[in-house]
Amino acid sequence: MISGSEYHKEYMKGTTTVGLICEDGVVLATDKRATMGNLIADKEAKKLYKIDDYIAMTIAGSVGDAQSLIRLLSAEAKIYKMRTGNNMTPLSCTTLTSNVLHGNRHYPLLTQLIIGGYDLINGPKLFSLDPVGGINEESSFTATGSGSPTAYGVLEAEYKSEINIEKGLLIAVKALISAMQRDAYSGNGISLAKIDKTGVTLYSDEEIENLVKKVTKKK
């Protein structure tokens, strides 16, 4: 019988997620494969979530831990909006997430997160968090999961400061394609979102396929 800790360790082996900060917003992207050891447990795993009108999050690690946290954050964002009439800022959401993770540091939620959002006053924001609540505010890009070393190679080569979302989407897709080609624990398609002054936009499979064709055509 597999223990809880062993179960979590199995699920931490897979995934590639990336986030890029652009001049006019943020781009988030993930693969769709969930693994349990060497088994592909799910080919349509959801790893990209809308938290609020202007905030989205990617997950890597234990699916159950991450989903529980997402439910909490979504509820808190709704309560905040009901009380204040305003959307929670990306920094506020990240701080809340950090506090929850740190509060569970003795029995940590085994997940690594990227939070992207658009602050109507301060513009696009991108953060990464470790399982015990450590926050890094990113000024360019970040990646998590087993495919991240390969993704970082593409991001380092392709990313330039002050790129727009249109270019950022293509870079994110290229990074995911490269990671899925090299990492056995990543694959089965891409999930993609942008966050700008109009809010969170989740891309359809057809829209993503068109971006994939643009990227592969350039090779």
UniProtKB/Swiss-Prot annotation:
HAMAP family: Proteasome_B_A. Belongs to the peptidase T1B family. Component of the proteasome core, a large protease complex with broad specificity involved in protein degradation. Residues 1-14 form a propeptide. GO terms for cellular component: cytoplasm; proteasome core complex, beta-subunit complex. The active site is at 15 (nucleophile). It catalyses: Cleavage of peptide bonds with very broad specificity. Its EC number is 3.4.25.1. Its main location: cytoplasm. GO terms for biological process: proteasomal protein catabolic process. Pfam families: Proteasome. It is found in: Cytoplasm. The gene is psmB. NCBIfam families: arc_protsome_B (TIGR03634). The formation of the proteasomal ATPase PAN-20S proteasome complex, via the docking of the C-termini of PAN into the intersubunit pockets in the alpha-rings, triggers opening of the gate for substrate entry. Interconversion between the open-gate and close-gate conformations leads to a dynamic regulation of the 20S proteasome proteolysis activity. The 20S proteasome core is composed of 14 alpha and 14 beta subunits that assemble into four stacked heptameric rings, resulting in a barrel-shaped structure. The two inner rings, each composed of seven catalytic beta subunits, are sandwiched by two outer rings, each composed of seven alpha subunits. The catalytic chamber with the active sites is on the inside of the barrel. Has a gated structure, the ends of the cylinder being occluded by the N-termini of the alpha-subunits. Is capped at one or both ends by the proteasome regulatory ATPase, PAN. This is Proteasome subunit beta. Signal peptide: none annotated. It comes from Methanococcus vannielii (strain ATCC 35089 / DSM 1224 / JCM 13029 / OCM 148 / SB). Keywords: Autocatalytic cleavage, Cytoplasm, Hydrolase, Protease, Proteasome, Threonine protease, Zymogen. One of its GO terms (molecular function) is threonine-type endopeptidase activity.
